[in-house]
Amino acid sequence: MIREHRSREKLESYYEKFTEEGILDPNVHPWVAESWQQSRALGVPREKMSTEKRFSPEEFHRLQAKHEDAIAYLMKLSEGIREFFQEYNLSLLLIDADCVVLKSYSLPFYQMTPGEIEGARVGVEEVGTSSISVAYEHQTPFWMFGPEMWVKECQLGDACTAPVKINGECQYLITLVSMEQIELPQDAVISLLLTMKTALEAHLTESVRIKAEEAILDATPFAVYHVLPGGEVAYTNQLGKERLTRIGAKQEHETGRRLNLNDVILNYEHTPIYKGFRGVPSYNKEVTWITTAKTYEDITTVVPLERDEEQAVKSVVVVSMPIEDLRTLVAHAAGYTAKYSLQSMVGS
């Protein structure tokens, strides 16, 4: 949220009045006032930020691995604007839903190196009032002026924090701290923060959806392939990987070279996949796949996907089930039908 510019001298006087005399000025933002009272009740030190409550190196390594997707995405997102961070003396933090700092991406956070701040908990119980604690409490972006911070060493710069929500639940917090050595408009910092928040939310939402779809495809009794021109396999489910591995297909992780059907299917140019790249779909076709290891007979469906500007097919989806697996599935279905038919239940 964008807040009206406030006099730092007045904010400092409100802070001193409360911390020294226990009197809350009515001009203090109600959320800040509420957090000040909580910080005082908790006995949070005011002079220096405490990072004593932190994970051990081993525990923190496991925590970062758990959140690797979000950490890596924000790293990639911030790489292109790192010079901007340096020019305007901005610090960027990614924090989990328990207020533990997962990653410090730019300049030292209040003179703390990444090693000092990463793995530390920065909730209201540890550091008192901050944009982090207020945004976490109210689940909305919040801008906090330096003199409103509970810890005095953090009062040199302003900060803004926004919650990152997936399916309505707060998963992370992103914080930008501006040390104001060069004047930067508040709305510029907030716009940058909200852009990063929205991008991270979109990425993580898509990632959750993809993982769910992959789990569904891995549980199905047929092989699924997403094939690019030339036979390169962009994606395959677990059964597809197992089948390709059995017939000798290799993926070179060092070079990034993917599995390629041309390497293992001797009659590739005579299969529905090859025809699919010419725009011809196939549905439930009985297909013979000739490999150096074995000859397979499958029921195969091939669907051409998106086309480029010249209407050339850019990729196809292949769904394939071995005929012997299909026979087994049909036999099981027939057995269940007989077992649970109405006649067998009534005993006639």
What is each residue range found by the language model?
Residues 1-65, 161, 165-187, 317, ...:
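Short, low-complexity N-terminal regulatory "tails/caps" that precede and couple sensory modules
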Residues 39-75, 82-85, 96, 102-140, ...:
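Intrinsically disordered, low-complexity polar/acidic regions
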Residues 65-76, 188, 192-219:
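Short, charged amphipathic alpha-helical "coupling" segments at sensory-output junctions
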Residues 74-93, 206-241:
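Sensory modules in modular signal-transduction proteins
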Residues 102-131, 223-280:
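PAS-family sensory domains
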Residues 147-152, 156-166, 264-325:
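PAS-family sensory/regulatory modules and their coupling/dimerization elements
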Residues 153, 212-217, 329-332, 336:
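Hydrophobic helical signal-relay modules used by sensory signaling proteins
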Residues 172-208, 304-347:
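Sensory coupling linkers of modular signal transduction proteins
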